[in-house]
């Protein structure tokens, strides 16, 4: 039996947009206001403390609510394939052991894209055995948060493309 086992949470949503517009949205997550616009119920603060947004080696600090608790997170961007994939991981080596990576990826389809959010968690048998209910609640909350982020991204980008709403088109290209 392995000491730690990977649990991978994934959420995907089809969006009527282009990979470039999805990545442009992510690239424009630069401050509290832009971060809250993505998920106003849970996102509180965001700032890039090293490098440029979503460039390999850049570090971002974020505050958000997950399962009703405030989390203060610091991530390093570990991989970027423009318009296809962003991978990021906790800065802390200790946290990285249990939360090794998260990804945002985009698969282009005919006329649409699929936005995929993935979180990888490493769990030990002790946690899975003795804290099963708490673990299930925590993972369920993370999955819900991921789903809401995808739904919000879809709403924002599809409304942006409609002729009656260009509120997100701030000229930041």
Language model segments and positions:
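Extended beta-strand/beta-hairpin segments
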Residues: 8, 164-167
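Short strand-connecting beta-turns/loops that link adjacent beta-strands
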Residues: 18, 82-83, 109-112
């Amino acid at each position: 039996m392995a000491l730690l086992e990977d649990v991978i949470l994934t959420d995907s949503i089809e969006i009527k947009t282009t990979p470039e517009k999805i990545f442009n949205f992510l690239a424009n997550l630069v401050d509290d206001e832009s971060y809250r616009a993505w998920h106003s119920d849970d996102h509180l603060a965001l700032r890039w403390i090293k490098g440029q947004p979503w460039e390999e080696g850049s570090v971002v600090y974020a505050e958000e609510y997950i399962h009703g608790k405030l989390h203060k997170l610091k991530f390093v961007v570990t991989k970027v394939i423009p318009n296809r994939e962003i991978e990021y991981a906790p800065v802390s080596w200790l946290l990285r052991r249990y939360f090794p990576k998260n990804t945002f990826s985009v698969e282009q389809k005919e006329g649409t894209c699929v936005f995929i959010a993935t979180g990888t968690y490493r769990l030990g048998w002790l946690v899975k055995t003795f804290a099963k209910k708490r673990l299930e609640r925590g993972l369920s909350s993370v999955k819900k948060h991921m789903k809401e982020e995808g739904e919000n991204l879809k709403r924002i980008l599809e409304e942006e493309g409609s002729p009656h709403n260009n509120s997100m088109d701030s000229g930041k290209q």
